Amino acid sequence: MKALLDLFKQVQQEEVFDAIKIGLASPDKIRSWSFGEVKKPETINYRTFKPERDGLFCAKIFGPIKDYECLCGKYKRLKHRGVICEKCGVEVTLAKVRRERMGHIELASPVAHIWFLKSLPSRLGMVLDMTLRDIERVLYFEAYVVIDPGMTPLKARQIMTEEDYYNKVEEYGDEFRAEMGAEGVRELLRAINIDEQVETLRSELKNTGSEAKIKKYAKRLKVLEAFQRSGIKPEWMILEVLPVLPPELRPLVPLDGGRFATSDLNDLYRRVINRNNRLKRLLELKAPEIIVRNEKRMLQEAVDSLLDNGRRGKAMTGANKRPLKSLADMIKGKGGRFRQNLLGKRVDYSGRSVIVVGPTLKLHQCGLPKLMALELFKPFIFNKLEVMGVATTIKAAKKEVENQTPVVWDILEEVIREHPVMLNRAPTLHRLGIQAFEPVLIEGKAIQLHPLVCAAFNADFDGDQMAVHVPLSLEAQMEARTLMLASNNVLFPANGDPSIVPSQDIVLGLYYATREAINGKGEGMTFTGVSEVLRAYENKEVELASRVNVRITEMVHNEDKSEGAPAFVPKISLYATTVGRSILSEILPPGLPFSVLNKPLKKKEISRLINTAFRKCGLRETVIFADQLMQSGFRLATRAGISICVDDMLVPPQKETIVGDAAKKVKEYDRQYMSGLVTAQERYNNVVDIWSATSEAVGKAMMEQLSTEPVTDRDGNETRQESFNSIYMMADSGARGSAVQIRQLAGMRGLMAKPDGSIIETPITANFREGLNVLQYFISTHGARKGLADTALKTANSGYLTRRLVDVTQDLVVVEDDCGTSQGVAMKALVEGGEVVEALRDRILGRVAVADVVNPETQETLYESGTLLDESAVEEIERLGIDEVRVRTPLTCETRYGLCASCYGRDLGRGSLVNVGEAVGVIAAQSIGEPGTQLTMRTFHIGGAASRAAVASSVEAKSNGTVRFTATMRYVTNAKGEQIVISRSGEALITDDHGRERERHKVPYGATLLQLDGAQIKAGTQLATWDPLTRPIITEWGGTVKFENVEEGVTVAKQIDDVTGLSTLVVIDAKRRGSQSSKSVRPQVKLLDANGEEVKIPNSEHSVQIGFQVGALITVKDGQQVQVGEVLARIPTEAQKTRDITGGLPRVAELFEARSPKDAGILAEVTGTTSFGKDTKGKQRLVITDLEGNQHEFLIAKEKQVLVHDGQVVNKGEMIVDGPADPHDILRLQGIEALSRYIVDEVQDVYRLQGVKINDKHIEVIVRQMLRRVQITDNGDTRFIPGEQVERSDMLDENDRMNAEDKRPATYENILLGITKASLSTDSFISAASFQETTRVLTEAAIMGKRDDLRGLKENVIVGRLIPAGTGLAFHKARKTKEMADRERFDQIAAEEAFEFGTPETPAAEQTPHTNE
């Protein structure tokens, strides 16, 4: 009996399949699914609670209510399995068939499926070549459509109103046929010959010239070809039979009090059945046409609401005015089937609880409350109890566990040993948000967490909760242990830095112990070893920070590499160190020298220390070392007894004078403003600058006072040493707080921002130590509130960005070791404003070289192409001063579906070459998304203090060398003999003796050059200066000013300052000008020479025209004499807003969405020479003449800044009109490498501003996914249509096929898609549907009869298979190999049998490839 029951318990083996296909069901198909027709709208009898026969819950159609029991109760029990009761007609079987048996409704009149009617573009409209409006009028019985014009002059598919129709009937009689409603549309669809239509469309496409037509035809052709390929008939878009969902999936549940709770679908079905039955009756009664028509329209509307309520017209509502939830609503959106149930399942064997700190744990352990463990490990305990014979049955074992007998606790200990559990803290923003630990049983109800993993989980102990999951199967336990154990995940996958870095009190303790003090107790003593130092310290003979000499034993790598020689040998040397440092030397792992500890350990130093340990000593030693560091840190912090006291916040005495001086300067600016020397805007900018500087100065004075203290040394001399002030130590060590926060405590709070981001010009001069007055407190609240509001909004934004990133990259997995490409990108150090922002070593670390790395001095090859550059390699490269290395990149990887390991390089989370099967796409998405969330949550900590980088107003050299100017640099010499820059994109370079570029600086228009080309300079020399607050307009020629179109009230306004009474002329915006004629004129200056002739541009006919931009303040008068290099007008730069990641996060999203910026700059389309053509109204004409002499014209709005001058040679892709770059232009004109460099640099800029490190390769992976589609330019002999966008791998596969068959392959161009668009245009419809716009995706997929090959991770999660990544990739590979082998064996046997029986073999060509769908 038991065996029999076990048989029933066994789950059926899941079906093995390789793909899922979606299509349209034909009416016959729907009938074949059905188990009977639902004829009545009744559900269940409210008295007997039994389902009504032929109703929506009918047992005859859908199956029995109770297992193995018919409705009337005649047949009960298993023995009647499969019998159909003759009384009630119910089959005796399991009740769960009510979850899978469908019914159907025979519709009295056909009905259009709303998805194919209303999704944009309307599929019905496409196929019929009619407008949506027309089809709707026909379907909803407002108009007739001509089906068959016969001999009449009418056209097929012509629409006519009822009146027209009757007129035409009178005129032509029954020569023609016209219909209304879905029948008419169905006839039209039936009449379409798809093959014929496709042929005509293809030929028309070739012959037509108009862009609009090509677009229209291509769209229609795509839909028709889809029907042709998938074998779906267009008339199936019109329903004749409606399937009915199994009743258990739309349940009706009796509540107490005789009421019922029901699924909305039942209501919707009821309406359909009611209307359908009424319509049948009306047709039988031969009711008047108008009544029937109305009923048909109502049926159409009822079916529409069932399929997608609210898509057309008003949504159907239930009793409580709430719109009913239709079938479409069930699957779409966050609460729909895809995202709620398929991608976000709840799991068994899990629990959650609050976390508390567990400082006594080892890194791989976590404390699990006993009661929780007992519940989670129940099945294992039951099993153990049975095996040990304590309990005979599971029931008895249950009882034992419930009573919590002593034996149960012993067994729990045993079961739990070496059985890892997974801990997860929401939000899981990156892979380290779930890690495995070995549980240690503890009393209490809170989970204990190791302090060092908090950084990875972003956890703290202020009430955070974590979830525990138990891996059940042996394989799961093994994966948890080898891949997810906390001690195996010590690096951040985003940047390869250690994630187990101590923080807060640990750092404080280590820092305190490694500081040195002058004239501490016992200074100058010498000890024979660490144990002696310890004894002296315990006996209070020496202090922790005293300088002493100690003999220290280090374990160093053995030079002797022979057999049996130890790896490490001791080396003893005498070090001048401090007591604390020598005590810490005890925990150094072998292979690290004492010098790494012989300095004050701040947080950054400790991070570097752990990093060094990992690279030199390996994982195991590092983990042990980190644990011991933590223990020491806690112990030392306790011993140190550091605390905070109000008196620690020392306010600098010179604060008063600094603030006083600033106030004087501000007054001076007010006075200048009053007398009209500066504008209100300039005054504001200057005042803000003064207060920023003051805030800095006070802060500096405060830090100077705080950071050192006077002390007497051993010889009795006064000297200063680094301070032991508690607050200073906390900030300096990196334990808590920052200089900015200390400045607010003891310096001055400084400038605050308004909620809109603009800076309030009166700063808070007080600090928290002195206290704020009411006004100051009020201003402070602005910043604090903005911070809190921002946080909430930006967390959501950042989460959405992460979701889009994951969606676009989820199918990118490393699938092979090497794709063998010879392409790559050249990496250089990233230099900005003369400073090396990112060194070359950081950019190439962990990448594979694609060209040999050559020593520049000796020309010998250091590293061959194909070498993975590790730490030692990059250090060597840096030492030799190599400034460019070509490396492989994910962008140029030639693997079709996925990536290869060589192009990706090092797996940053593991520190070695990436494994095949690593889901690098998801890791990249998480690495970029995770800090976004972090940052967005982090803004308000500064309390809104306006931290604005002071604007640069000069450039100075950082290194010695020779000044060189780029070809684009142009300057003129003015009357004072100063060199004034007049080029917009000039750069100054500093080169070393070998002529290698050391730094590069942009020099803005209007700057004064202090050094010229070829000058030898020392570091620190100023190269150029300029006014940062205004942009000048400068003349390159001398002469007499002659104004044109400078008319007051038309193009310029006289601004009279209310305060000063002085007037200036300001150019006004064309949009604000009154009359139409004045909108096109542009105020400008012409110059006249001594004879009153217009000055001409040398070597051309054009006279000099200098235009003024909107907002320019004109500083010259009409008729004034000007010299070369003089300023004609100034444009004030806008008031500065504070920058934090608020600007940053949308910027990142904008880059990844590949949006074209508003006023994008214009790039040169060709290489050639520039000249200016004739200006049209409001636009200037720029002409580029290429090398063949062809001219390319650009029309440019006059207010734009043109960066080129007459006769300049520009290269293709060079910026010619100022403005933000458009990534699509960069891709088109400069190629993939330039595009990737642009996106990577721009994204990195945003993150760098926040001090977040992300490796470039993560961004490159995303860019690869944005480039995964191409646009066909010429289709050759392929199946594509010109202008169609297809998956790159598809394209390449098809071209390979063409080449193999000696046909013409297609040509294509790269296109850049934003991440949302790329996610939606993926080949997998399951993945796209679960992302966004579910209805549209499914509609399209159904018509095209799409097949999803389940390549990505998301599709596989949804269908419930192992994902094709990591161990799953190997599993699927093995499965496929086995299938292939089986198939070959099968074919072989078949062939042998065929040979034996002498039947002719089937030719190979006709054998259909076998796929499991």
Curated annotation (Swiss-Prot):
UniProt keyword annotation of Transmembrane present:
no
Q: Which residues bind Zn(2+) 2?
A: C819, C893, C900, C903
**Listed name of the protein:** DNA-directed RNA polymerase subunit beta'
> GO cellular component annotations, sorted alphabetically?
DNA-directed RNA polymerase complex
Q: Which family does it belong to?
A: Belongs to the RNA polymerase beta' chain family.
Q: Which GO terms describe its molecular function?
A: DNA binding; DNA-directed RNA polymerase activity; magnesium ion binding; zinc ion binding
Q: Which CDD domains match?
A: RNAP_beta'_C, RNAP_beta'_N
Against PANTHER family, the record matches this protein to: DNA-DIRECTED RNA POLYMERASE, DNA-DIRECTED RNA POLYMERASE SUBUNIT BETA
Which cofactor is recorded for it? Mg(2+); Zn(2+)
How is the cofactor bound, as the UniProt entry phrases it?
A: Binds 1 Mg(2+) ion per subunit. Binds 2 Zn(2+) ions per subunit.
Q: Which residues bind Zn(2+) 1?
A: C70, C72, C85, C88
Q: Which domain of life is it from?
A: Bacteria
Q: Which Pfam families match?
A: RNA_pol_Rpb1_1, RNA_pol_Rpb1_2, RNA_pol_Rpb1_3, RNA_pol_Rpb1_4, RNA_pol_Rpb1_5
Q: Which reaction does it catalyse?
A: RNA(n) + a ribonucleoside 5'-triphosphate = RNA(n+1) + diphosphate
| The UniProt record lists the keyword Iron-sulfur | no
- Residues binding Mg(2+) are D460, D462, D464
Complexes and interactors: The RNAP catalytic core consists of 2 alpha, 1 beta, 1 beta' and 1 omega subunit. When a sigma factor is associated with the core the holoenzyme is formed, which can initiate transcription.
